[in-house]
Each structure stands twice: as C-alpha cells, then as structure tokens.
Regions:
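Conserved SAM-binding loop
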Residues: 22-23, 46, 102, 211
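Hydrophobic helical membrane-anchoring modules
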Residues: 191, 202-226
Length: 226
C-alpha cells in the first residue's frame, strides 16, 4: 500500500465567502489542515482552483499542487467526482499510489494522531475504504421532521422500538459521519464510484476533534475552542 494525502479546497462557498481562507484566530481555516499534515511522511496533494490557497500550501512545503479544473470546482461538484478526475492525472504522475487519505479543511480540530490512527486501522484490517465518525450530539430518537411550522405539524424522524424513560436507556448507539477523514483504495473508488465500498471501516474520533465548520456560527464557536 502506498498512501497519499489529499486536501480538496475549492474556491468560494455558499455559506461563508472564501470559507477555506477565512481567518480563525491567527490562521486561515485551510492552514489548520496544512499544519496537521506538514510532518507526515506521505505525498501530499492540494486540490484547489484558488491560487491563494495553492500559495499558502507552498509555504507549508506542500509542493504537489493540483489545480482543479472548472468542471470539478463548482458548488455542485461532489468529492467523488473531484477524486475520480484527480486519479486520472495521478496515474500519470505517480502510478504507485494506491490509497487516498482525504482530509476536508473544515475540520480544524482534527489531530495528527487521528490521521495516523485511521491509516493504521485501515491497513491492519485490510479495508477498501474508511471514514471517521463520532458520537452524535443528539440522539435520532429526539430528532423531528417539521412538515408545516405554522400548523405545528411534525413527526419523529425515527420511531422508537419501545417506550424509554431515560435517554441512557435508548437501544441504539448513535454516531455520525464527521467528515474529518476518508480513506479509499483507488481501484475501489473507480469500481464503486463512491467513498464507501463493500469492505468499509470506521474510525471513532472524540466529539471535540470532530467539530466541523459550515457557517459563521461555527467559526464563532471554533474560536472559543482553539
């Protein structure tokens, strides 16, 4: 197995303008990921259509930069589509790389040890794919679907199997995909057209390290956590 670290960081965002470059304390958001990977002994690729992000990557001695083409840089372009386009180029650049470790820039509290531990589990268990998860902040039994707020029309998203009097007695252990780490075998990515395969692993992260930034409110919270 030969791993490569991939950081997809496109230009712009619908929720926060230039989110990956938005300042969080003394660094831009994407720099937290650059800092996490700078001493890892893997080839590193920054996938971006923003020259400013590519320049920042160079400052962290991440010199393998891949400028995303227009067709994989829009807000509707999925991570899978971006990766599939990238591996075509990668086949020419370094055909020995077999596994991709994808790190979203929106996880500034992810730690270097999380990345290493996830890779080690992936290798030990011989998975084809893996993603990181953490315990849900709220249980799905307590989630509701609002059909019409004005008419106070709603229902529970997940029906309980029986009546529970205490939250700790719920019969489902609820976790969510936190988006911090994805690992995928390149051949399986091309086969399944997905980052989830028929031999998939999970890596459990602490809630604190799983914090994901999507909007301005998240930035405000993150500033207090960092």
């Amino acid at each position: 197995m030969k791993f490569a670290i991939i950081v997809p960081a496109r230009k712009g965002s619908k929720t926060v303008k230039d989110k990956n470059l938005y300042k969080l304390k003394n660094k831009s958001l994407v720099e937290y990921t650059f800092n996490q990977i700078k001493n890892l002994n893997f080839k590193k690729f920054i996938l971006s259509n923003d020259e400013r992000i590519l320049r920042k990557a160079s400052k962290y001695k991440i010199n393998i930069l891949y400028k995303r083409p227009k067709e994989t840089s829009g807000s509707k372009s999925s991570t899978v589509k971006t990766l599939l386009h990238f591996v075509k180029w990668l086949k020419i650049y370094d055909k020995d790389i077999s596994e991709l470790v994808v790190l979203q820039p929106t996880s500034p509290l992810r730690e270097r040890k999380d990345i290493i531990n996830a890779i080690n589990i992936y290798k030990k268990k011989k998975f084809y794919s893996l993603f990181s998860i953490s315990e849900s902040l709220e249980h799905p039994y307590e989630a509701i679907n609002i059909k019409n707020l004005k008419n106070n029309s709603w229902n529970y998203v997940l029906k309980k199997s029986k009546k529970f009097y205490r939250r700790q007695d719920f019969d489902i252990n609820s976790y969510f995909i936190n988006g911090a780490i994805y690992i995928i075998n390149i051949n399986k990515l091309k086969q399944f057209k997905s980052i989830v395969t028929n031999n998939h692993g999970l890596y459990v992260m602490r809630k604190f390290n799983s914090f994901d930034i999507n909007d301005f409110e998240d930035f405000k919270i993150a500033k207090k956590l960092i």
